[in-house]
Amino acid sequence: MNSVSAQVTFNHDQELLGEASDDLFGWSVDLSGDGNTIIVGAIGNNAGFANVSNNGHARVYRNTFNASFNSWSWVLLGQEINATASSVESGYDVGINYDGNAIVIGTPGQDRMRVYDLNVSDNWSPRNSNGYTISSSQSAQRAGHSVSINGNGNVAAMGAPLGNKVWIFDIEPNVGTGLMSGNPLVVPGTYAGGSVDLDDEGNSVVVGAYKSNSERGQVLVYDFNGANWVQRGQILSGVNNYDQFGFDVSMSNDGNTIAVGSKGWDSNPNNTTYEIGETTVYDWNGSNWVQRGSSIQGINIFDQCGFSVSLSGNGNRMAIGYKGSNEATTAAGLVRIFDWNGTAWVQNGDPIYGDGASVYSGHSVALSDNGSILAIGAIQGTGPINEFTNQQGQVRVYEGECLVSTSAVIQNGNTLTAVANASYQWLDCNNGNQPIPNAIEQVYVAQNPGSYSVQITENGCTQTSACFDITITSLKNEKIDNFLVFPNPTSNIITVNSDLFIQEMQILDVAGKLILTISNSNTADLINISPGIYFLTIQFNNGGIGHVKILKQ
């Protein structure tokens, strides 16, 4: 495999501020998948209730072109959405769908998650007048402590950590069936639902239970099979007491990569208050969750590495909040960006520091799907001129270079496979990177010795892989097309029908990870592979190779 991962500076784009003292603006933040819209929670805002704090509200901003100044800026979109009661901490967590036209707001003081859609007047209209709540027969669960919404805005999850539950709803307008599976998802552990995140389809969810086992913490992943939520793989656990593994979690779009923040981690298990922190990434290999690379650890006491985490859509870029870091100045906090280069997590650029003492930058972080837009919440930050007695909170937005999955180009003889769900153009490196005519498929079979690369376009971003040298001693590795794979889509077994003998079949996920190898057989059992898109490579006995995309349902 090879990769492209440049050191990118994230440039400060704009600063958004809370409207009043002690708003705690930036307590929560989320970016739309396209990176054009941002939602911010401010749990300290009084929301119109006189002399009462911690009511909370949420604001939404959209990146808008101003013709008068010939520039782009983040502009308030629609009305601010206030709490409907006092002391309910509305905005404790927030979520937004891919195009930024549907939002969810957690209100744990009411055990409620409210859903809004952007209407034709550019205001926010409630999708359900009462929001989505726990059953009236159940005691308070702090539901809404964590929330998430899927890419098209039709599935939403609400963590209820005092009940160790996650309430997951089908909220599709006019046809949504309400609570999926008919019951909330009951998750083992203590404070389960303290953190949640959905995949893009809304069929997978990662759940943190960070107070489990003397606050070692644990994380579980579930898939929806059409009727029930079923645990996928093993329970992931922290190492030491008070690690708080699962304090925050993030899931890639395909649901096969998760990032887990452990804000309380310390290499010395006897230290219960140092909170250096650690963040770990796991990939699904078809049967288990396997750690990807080394864990990323804080450096100093009170760093709280992993207080907040966010993955790009493809899971190859990660933003980590170090909320308590004293590196710049006391409790300024910081955020670091890491890119996966194919073998390790590499820090991208310099840390982004909070701009003053005790602003707690990194309390919340969010990345767009392509990893180019970054939002950072600092709950006690201020603007250039502090017009308030106390800090109102801030969110700073940054823009950098997008990230493309060029880390998964696989070479097999004279066959190159770009394993990414994207568009392709193969290039001739020995001819000034000139495009090869009609070479726009995922697989390229070189007919001549030389050096070749691929230009991949994904989520509006384009990058080029490194060059691969091809030495051809024969042309036996030709691309084979005369075979049939069925059924496709499949829920279980696939069969390859060909006149040629099959030596080996390999199944890879969209990130290029090998999921399954089958030798000397024309069938493959996918029963233990989670739903999604995969790539099947077939090695025939004549040296030929076949490739096909398969969909596991």
Q: Language-model features: where?
A:
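Surface-exposed coil/turn segments at beta-strand junctions on protein surfaces, enriched
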Residues: 20, 85, 138, 240, ...
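A short beta-strand segment in extracellular, disulfide-stabilized domains
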Residues: 411-420, 493-497
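C-terminal outer-membrane/trafficking sorting elements
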Residues: 423-432, 440, 444-451, 455-462, ...
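Terminal edge beta-strands and adjacent linker/stalk segments
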Residues: 130, 465-471
